[in-house]
From Swiss-Prot:
Residue window of motif KID motif: 644-646
Protein's organism: Rotavirus A (strain RVA/Cow/United States/NCDV-Lincoln/1969/G6P6[1]) (RV-A)
Record region (Spike head): 65-224
Region (Spike body and stalk (antigen domain)): 248-479
Protein name: Outer capsid protein VP4
Classification via Pfam families: Rota_VP4_MID, VP4_haemagglut, VP4_helical
Note: In group A rotaviruses, VP4 defines the P serotype. Some rotavirus strains are neuraminidase-sensitive and require sialic acid to attach to the cell surface. Some rotavirus strains are integrin-dependent. Some rotavirus strains depend on ganglioside for their entry into the host cell. Hsp70 also seems to be involved in the entry of some strains.
Cystine connections: 203-216, 318-380
Family in the record: Belongs to the rotavirus VP4 family.
Chain positions covered by the region annotation Spike foot: 510-775
Taxonomic lineage: Viruses, Riboviria, Orthornavirae, Duplornaviricota, Resentoviricetes
Record site: Cleavage: 231-232, 241-242, 247-248
Keywords: Capsid protein, Coiled coil, Disulfide bond, Hemagglutinin, Host cell membrane, Host cytoplasm, Host cytoskeleton, Host endoplasmic reticulum, Host membrane, Host-virus interaction, Membrane, Outer capsid protein, Viral attachment to host cell, Viral penetration into host cytoplasm, Viral penetration via permeabilization of host membrane, Virion, Virus entry into host cell
InterPro entries: ConA-like_dom_sf (IPR013320), Rota_A_VP4 (IPR042546), Rota_VP4_MID (IPR035330), Rota_VP4_MID_sf (IPR038017), VP4_concanavalin-like (IPR000416), VP4_helical (IPR035329)
Length: 775
């Protein structure tokens, strides 16, 4: 159980974003596809064919929908559809070969009776009679003439719901769409010198290859995909299609597009990834024959290597997912060898390696697209680990091997002891290899996978070579640097302190008798179980208890409003009173009847275990569950106190009372306070004041002078259940005046009744307070 609590406390010290990886695992088959960006823009439209990055061949993969592009005049490539997306009525597009074909398209809104309108076509004002009898659909009309001074005639109208239109140069003709959606078809106009026809688009447009004409027709009839209709899709200049690519180098920084403030930079990098596994081998308390777990842990590794003559400093974090749990039980006797859980990674597991280096590619990694990578495979083999028993031959876990194969790359954040870094997460799928692993001198043999006992074998690190490519949006001025999204300091000293505490506990447990081992097992989180077998520590314990009592006599706890029950002894239920406004800074106890502690200690008690259990009855840390389902409300302050103890390498007579007082004063960071009379006046945490009637919970005008008098003459109460929660409770369930008054003063018995009834309103309020206290 102690190990469970250690793990729960450690869980609160780390934040891991795995949702994207979990959703992707096993959902697609990974294939290596060679990709060279061709002369087109890639603007956040899916699907995208990912590949290993830039390689030295001529293969080109085109997107189905290239764009959107900004309105412009240019010579469209032959055999490519221009998919136009106008937003308003008027001229949509015009084009001419300046010889025998002038062609323009106009858009007419629904429900337009025959009317004469003026349009500007090829720089001239033209009067055109138009109409649209449809009540819901927009109408595209082609206007065509064959001489510069000729009159325009109307052709090939298209009635459209999605308001999209297409035009293409192909085979000596200009193709357009006509008919009515969702059954529109293509038509064409013959022209000479069709390849020299310049087009002027007056709206955003896309470019679709002729090979995808069926998809273009689908868009014309049914509209663009939802992703293209969001504010996140921004049109770019048509010049972004003209990208010059050079042969790959170990370091490449290529300007993809550039505006006055921002530019897109493509970074291509050859990289060397070095990583190692970390593990945690935890020995259970007892005589030394049992291990509670052998597990994987995230491992940080920092190194340098040379890339294109430049020394690069890199940092990797290796973690695993999809772990398989095994166990071995040699028997029920205290001297039987037992491993409660040992972890193994196999073909259903994944390895994540977060990579960061000090190159320019990682300095502005905020907005990234077109991310791809190609990495080699690597084999990881297990070494030998001996389980040191007090007596007898040591069991040895040996062997095991897996190979890692690249399965994708995403953005990530990796945490070091000092800072978090925006990095690339390379995901690897696993396949099992020879040899299998076994535990010598046990019946465990012939199992495949890599166990956590010694995953690095005798190697300092494993190494993978590869290459990645990405396009990042960065400031045009290189002197500006965008901030890293996550820039926080990360502390991992809690784990080290817990490890020291665990070792001390295990060493102690092996020195005392079996009867006291049983007592320790019954009190796994009792702070005195650390030293319950050593008689000399009892005096220190009594001194601590005495100091606790003295310390609390000096604090504001002496004037407690209500008594605490055993079930809520460690929760924030002892509400303090005070005679001044300064008492609003508060007081609620995390302990029960502290003043009675010393009276329960009998100096003449002959048994060490009796003395320890006597103290333990008053100073007991209850188990703190980290999940909200079935959450134990008995101990809000346990985690606070436990952390303080864990961070202390030594406990002296002054440590415990200081911790207790601090926990009692500060374990709820955000509180509301109220003053009680015939009216109830509440001061919220942002300094705003409200007044309510107790019977009806109706808000009444706030009397500042009366509030000042009440603060001076009546008790100020720290609110566990605020008025918003009370009013919600009264509106939905109905509560009596006495229940309201009991809740106003946070009576622990009434709180417990509502909690036992699984009342969601009270439960949610207390859960929110507990969330404020998360470590």
């Amino acid at each position: 159980m102690a190990s469970l609590i250690y793990r729960q406390l450690l869980t609160n010290s780390y934040t891991v974003e795995l949702s994207d990886e979990i959703q992707e695992i096993g959902s697609t088959k990974t294939q290596d596809v060679t990709v060279n960006p061709g002369p087109f823009a890639q603007t956040n439209y899916a699907p995208v064919n990912w590949g290993p990055g830039e390689t030295n061949d001529s293969t080109t993969v085109e997107p189905v929908l290239d764009g959107p592009y900004q309105p412009t005049t240019f010579n469209p490539p032959v055999s490519y559809w221009m998919l136009l997306a106008p937003t308003n009525a008027g001229v949509v597009v015009e084009g001419t070969n300046n010889t025998n074909r002038w062609l323009a398209t106009i858009l007419i809104e629904p429900n337009v009776q025959q009317v004469e309108r003026t349009y500007t076509l090829f720089g001239q004002q033209v009067q055109v009679t138009v109409s649209n009898d449809s009540q819901t659909k927009w109408k595209f009309v082609d206007l065509s003439k064959q001489t510069q001074d000729g009159n325009y005639s109307q052709h090939g109208s298209l009635l459209s719901t999605p308001k999209l239109y297409g035009v293409m140069k192909h085979g000596g003709k200009i193709y357009t769409y006509n008919g009515e959606t969702p059954n529109a078809t293509t038509g064409y106009y013959s022209t000479t010198n069709f390849d020299t026809v310049n087009m002027t688009a007056y709206c955003d447009f896309y470019i679709i290859p002729l090979a995808q004409e069926a998809k273009c027709t689908e868009y014309i009839n049914n509209g663009l995909p939802p992703i293209q209709n969001t504010r996140n899709i921004v049109p770019v200049s048509i010049v972004s299609r003209n990208i010059v690519y050079t042969r790959a180098q170990p370091n490449q920084d290529i300007v993809v597009s550039k505006t006055s403030l921002w530019k897109e930079m493509q970074y291509n990098r050859d990289i060397v990834i070095r990583f190692k596994f970390a593990n945690s081998i935890i020995k259970s308390g007892g005589l030394g024959y049992k291990w509670s777990e052998v597990s994987f842990k995230p491992a940080n590794y920092q190194y340098t290597y040379t890339r294109d003559g430049e020394e690069v400093t890199a940092h990797t974090t290796c973690s695993v997912n999809g772990i398989n749990d095994f166990n071995y039980n040699g028997g029920s006797l205290p001297t039987d060898f037992v491993i409660s859980k040992y972890e193994v990674i196999k073909e259903n597991s994944f390895v994540y390696i977060d990579y960061w280096d000090d190159s320019q590619a990682f300095r502005n990694m905020v907005n990234v697209r077109s991310l791809a990578a190609d990495l080699n495979s690597v084999m990881c083999t297990g070494g030998d680990y001996s389980f040191a028993l007090p007596v007898g031959n040591y069991p040895v876990m040996t062997g095991g091997a897996v190979s890692l194969h690249s399965a994708g790359v995403t953005l990530s954040t990796q945490f070091t002891d000092f800072v978090s870094l925006n990095s690339l997460r390379f995901r690897f799928r696993l396949s099992v290899e020879e040899p299998p692993f076994s535990i010598l001198r046990t019946r465990v043999s012939g199992l495949y996978g890599l166990p956590a006992a010694r995953p690095n074998n005798s190697q300092e690190y494993y190494e993978i070579a590869g290459r990645f490519s990405l396009i990042s949006l960065v400031p045009s001025n290189d002197d500006y640097q965008t901030p890293i999204i996550n820039s926080v300091t990360v502390r991992q000293d809690l784990e080290r302190q817990l490890g020291e505490l665990r070792d001390e506990f295990n060493n102690l447990s092996q020195q005392i008798a079996m009867s006291q081992l049983i007592d320790l097992a019954l009190l796994p989180l009792d702070m005195f179980s650390m030293f319950s077998g050593i008689k000399s520590t009892i005096d220190a314990a009594k001194s601590m208890a005495t100091n606790v009592m003295k310390r609390f006599k000096k604090s504001s706890l002496a004037n407690s409003v209500s008594t605490l029950t055993n079930s809520l002894s460690d929760a924030a239920s002892s509400i303090s009173r005070s005679a001044s406004v300064r008492s609003v800074s508060s007081t609620a106890s995390a302990w029960t009847e502290v003043s009675n502690i010393t009276s329960d200690i009998n100096v003449t008690t002959s048994s060490i275990s009796t003395q320890t259990s006597t103290i333990s009855r008053r100073l007991r840390l209850k188990e703190m569950a980290t999940q909200t389902d079935g959450m134990n409300f008995d101990d809000i302050s346990a985690a606070v106190l436990k952390t303080k103890i864990d961070k202390s390498t030594q406990l002296n007579t002054n440590t415990l009372p200081e911790i207790v007082t601090e926990a009692s004063e500060k374990f709820i960071p955000n509180r509301a306070y109220r003053v009680k009379d015939d009216e109830v006046l509440e001061a919220s945490t942002d300094g705003k004041y409200f007044a309510y009637k107790v019977e009806t919970f109706e808000e009444i005008p706030f009397d500042v002078q009366k509030f000042a008098d009440l603060v001076t003459d009546s008790p100020v109460i720290s609110a566990i259940i605020d008025f918003k929660t009370l009013k919600n409770l009264n509106d939905n369930y109905g509560i009596s005046r006495q229940q309201a008054l009991n809740l106003l003063r946070s009576d622990p018995r009434v709180l417990r009744e509502f909690i036992n009834q699984d009342n969601p309103i009270i439960r949610n309020r207390i859960e929110s307070l507990i969330m404020q206290c998360r470590l």
